[in-house]
Swiss-Prot record:
The modification Leucine amide is found at residue 8. Corpora cardiaca. Its main location: secreted. This is Pyrokinin-3. It comes from Periplaneta americana (American cockroach). One of its GO terms (biological process) is neuropeptide signaling pathway. The keyword Secreted applies. Mediates visceral muscle contractile activity (myotropic activity). The keyword Secreted applies. Keywords: Amidation, Neuropeptide, Secreted. Belongs to the pyrokinin family. GO terms for cellular component: extracellular region. It is found in: Secreted.
């Protein structure tokens, strides 16, 4: 899990 959500 990452603290951010990359915009793909």
């Amino acid at each position: 899990l990452v603290p951010f959500r990359p915009r793909l």
